[in-house]
C-alpha cells in the first residue's frame, strides 16, 4: 500500500480531488483493514495453482508463521495470541500458511463502514479509485490482480471502492515498482510488485526491512523514503520502529526475543500497511523424479533453494501424491526433533 504517492503517470483518477481522496483513505487504518479482509487469497493463488491447489500458496502474515518456534509455539501462534488486543476483528483469526485466515467479506464491510464515516467527515469523495499496475506480459499476474479487483469490489461495492488495473510493458512496470529510483517514482496505490526472502533465521531478517530508516525497502513496500514524512507520522510507523528496536535489544532470552518480534508483527498485521497474499513455496503442480525431502532444507539463505543440489536423490518413477504425503509426514517428525535440538543449542549461544 502506497501511503505517500507523489506521481500519477499511470492513473485513472480524473482530478486532484480523487487523488486526495485516495491518499486520505489509504492513511486510514480501518480502510486498509477493509481491503485486507476483502482480498480472497485462495482465489488469487488459484490463478497459478488451480482451484484445487489454490490454498497451498496462501500466506496471511509477513513473517513465515513457522519461521521460528519457542516452547511448542511457532511464530504465527505467538502473533495470534497478541492480535486480539488490537480489536475484536482479530479474534479467531488463523495466521497459518496454506489457508485463508483473513478473507472475510463481513469483516471487510464492518471495517469499511467505520472508515467511510470518518473519511466523509474529512471531505473524502467516493468511490475511492485505487491504481494497480501489472506487467501485461505475465498472464497469471494479470489474472491475479483481476481476482483482487473482483473480490474487493464485490465485498465493498463499486460505489465505494474501484480498482483500476493498468497493464504495462515489463519495463514500464518495473520502472515504477521494483526499479523505481526513489519513492517519488513509485506510481501506484496498490502493488503486487514486492516480495521478500529471509537471509538468516531470526524474525529481524523480515521485520527490520520495514523500519522507517530502511528507505530502499520502504519506497517499494509503502511508497515513501523519508522516515520523517507526514504519512509516516499519520500511520504511526515510529511505534513499529520502537517495537522492532525493543526486540533487537533482547539478547539473553530467546523466548522473550521472539515474543517481542511477534508483538511487532501483530502491530504490522493490525496496521494493514502490508497485505500478504502468497508465498513462493506454494508453487503449481510439477512432475518430479526427485525423492521427496532428500535435499537440504533451510528457512533462510540459499541452501533451501532449487539451485542447491547437494543431498538430492533421484528415482526412476514420477513422484506421486501418496509418496509425497507419506514422506512429508516422516519429514515433519524428523524436523520437530531437529528444531527442538536446534532451539536448545541456540539458546545457549544467545548473549
PLM features per residue range, with description:
Residues 45-49, 114-137, 238-288, 345:
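Bilobed periplasmic-binding protein-like "clamshell/Venus-flytrap" ligand-binding domains
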Residues 2-26, 68-106, 120-123, 178-184, ...:
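Short, solvent-exposed loop/beta-turn-alpha elements that line the ligand-binding surface or hinge
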Residues 188-207, 277-280:
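Ligand-binding clamshell of periplasmic/extracellular solute-binding protein-like
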Residues 1-77, 81, 96-100, 127-137, ...:
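Alpha-helical secondary-structure segments
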Residues 53, 86-198, 254, 335:
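Ligand/substrate-recognition segments at binding pockets and active sites
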Residues 29, 33, 37, 42, ...:
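Solvent-exposed, polar/charged alpha-helical surfaces in well-ordered, non-transmembrane soluble domains
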Residues 8-11, 46, 140-143, 173-176, ...:
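Extracytoplasmic/secreted cell-surface and envelope-processing proteins
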